[in-house]
Amino acid sequence: MPRVSTHLVKLAAAALCALLLSAVAASATSRIKDLANIEGIRQNQLIGYGLVVGLNGTGDTLNNIPFTKQSLQAMLERMGVNIRGATIRTGNVAAVMVTGNLPPFATQGTRMDVTVSALGDAKNLQGGTLLVTPLLGADGNVYAVAQGSLAIGGFQAEGEAAKITRGVPTVGRIANGAIIEREIEFALNRLPNVRLALRNADFTTAKRIAAAVNDYLGTKCAEPLDPSTVQLSIPGEFKGNAVALLTEIEQLQVEPDQAAKIVIDERSGIIVMGRDVRVATVAVAQGNLTVSISESPQVSQPNPLGGGRTVVTPNSRIGVTEDGKKLAVVKDGVSLQQLVDGLNSLGIGPRDLIGILQAIKAAGAIEADIEVM
């Protein structure tokens, strides 16, 4: 049996890898499901005010937080306990705000997560239990009711002379802590048309989505209204069954387009640049000026019998150093990788790079939008 050359096997493997990589690069497409949302299908924010009990002396100070005391009195009175005029001394209760997101198409009886945040001067919500709390929508109606034990991500420990805090112990979560009591009606199947809202507005992407839908259905039922909206008229065979149509459409592959953009976070020095960033011909010079000041006080000691006194005289040393300036010419139409490599060759760090990119943009030599966070 003839032996297969190891060299040929390696060449074949390398060729196969190259073909796979080129195929992946050529098919930089995304599903419509990942590029756009269906207009009207969204979460709704809920909020409520409640009490957390069972805290180990880390709750609100009732004398300092009057609304906690009033809420506790009102709750006990509803349960038949009259404490009007009585002195309440407890550190185991905290007033909190409860927030959550009502999922789209949520039905009665399903559950949702909620976040519980201290409203007063409570130090720690660890070990606490949220009492029944109605959650209201923007229209004032109650859509869910929350209750349960809190899970805290942070903690706090203290002694007589020291205190340690990790994370935020005054915020906690209750997984599946709210039961949905009211549904938001949305008759999707009865809509004559549906709008797709692009997550990143772009004329080209909107046109490509409409073209992909029309090609798939074989009829012109989708049209871009603006860079962020594509309107889809429900064809006759899908009347009353828009869900089936959207299930098929959201799986279609589209190659999204995006404007050249550079995002800069000045606090952390992070710079993110898209692949379409191009730079015109420009010269870049970078030099660092360093001023150092050092103080070394000197003591002047008189002779033992001289009658003088000991004094301290300041001795300041000031030094100025400037790194050798470097000048580089960035040629017209260079890509992102070439730009980064060229600036790195000058010994430029991320924070210096931020200023250079802004200066290149001000000179009109960079073809991209710069967003500073």
From Swiss-Prot:
One of its GO terms (cellular component) is outer membrane-bounded periplasmic space. Pfam families: FlgI. Disulfide bonds: none annotated. Its main location: periplasm. It comes from the Bacteria. It is found in: Periplasm; Bacterial flagellum basal body. Belongs to the FlgI family. This is Flagellar P-ring protein.
